[in-house]
Swiss-Prot record:
Chief location bin: cytoplasm
Pfam family, one: Response_reg
Subunit note: Interacts with the RNA polymerase core.
Subcellular location: Cytoplasm
Sites bearing 4-aspartylphosphate, chain numbering: 57
One Gene Ontology molecular-function label: transcription cis-regulatory region binding
Name used for this protein in its record: Transcriptional regulatory protein ResD
Ranges of residues in domain Response regulatory: 8-121
SUPFAM superfamilies: CheY-like (SSF52172)
Post-translational note: Phosphorylated by ResE.
Length: 240
């Protein structure tokens, strides 16, 4: 699959009829579709191939979608949409904490899936595939950290940092208003665009992952994301 220039999507679900349905609608949009029928196969394919997006069922026998997401996130920033059933809100929260970018509730409209896929691919393409040599002006520059918003490119001490679309959006939202404190509810509303009635720990988990990624490149850059105890988070210009 990696030998084509097509947009490649991995569809993961233990139900063959759902895989067929999603394949049919997504191929109409000229996406190249690959399938996995269980979590272990999804992990193997997700780590070996370079997919542009993964549609991932949450509840599967054996290795579930949360574990699949967690293992892929350890190695890659591939955009992931979780497919969940009604009544699985607690598991959806775990999915966000594991690193999923969005979720769709079953039973779903195939057209909604296509729209969500297009929206996430659009954000991901801005983050991952923009030509970094294109001149841009919308750049936030701080000591040890710069954020080129037009290119969706983050560098810490001169080294590019690979972030998921949601991690990037969270960092940029905080950094564009330095020293302003945001509570978790505000961050959920502004960064997670879709309706979400989940656990506020989702924000904490994304902040933790963001700090870890920055810290691997520049501990000074990671310190700029500051916890305001009992309130929320802020981006502190002078923090080093």
């Amino acid at each position: 699959m990696d030998q084509t220039n097509e947009t490649k999507i991995l569809v993961v679900d233990d139900e063959a009829r759902i895989r067929r349905l999603l394949r049919m609608y997504l191929e109409r949009e000229n996406y190249a579709i690959d399938e996995a029928e269980n979590g272990d196969e999804a992990i193997a394919k997700g780590l070996e191939a370079n997919y542009d997006l993964i549609l991932l069922d949450l509840m599967m026998p054996g290795t579930d979608g949360i574990e699949v997401c967690r293992q892929i996130r350890e190695k890659k920033a591939t955009p992931i949409i979780m497919l969940t059933a009604k009544g699985e809100e607690a598991n959806r929260v775990q999915g966000f904490e594991a690193g999923t970018d969005d979720y769709i509730v079953k039973p779903f409209s195939p057209r909604e899936v296509v729209l969500r896929v297009k929206a996430l691919l659009r954000r991901a393409s801005q983050t991952s595939y923009f030509n970094a040599n294109t001149p841009t002006k919308n750049v936030l520059v701080f000591s040890h950290l710069s954020i080129d918003h037009d290119a969706h490119r983050v560098t810490a001490d001169g080294t590019e940092v690979s972030l998921t679309p949601k991690e990037y959006e969270l960092l940029y939202f905080l950094a564009k208003t330095p020293d302003k404190v945001y509570d978790r509810e505000k961050l959920l509303k502004e960064v997670w665009q879709y309706e979400f009635f989940g656990d506020l720990r989702t924000v904490d988990t994304h902040v933790k992952r963001l700090r870890e990624k920055l810290n691997k490149v520049s501990p000074e850059a990671a310190k700029k994301i500051v916890t305001v105890w009992g309130v929320g988070y802020k981006f502190e210009v002078g923090a080093e």
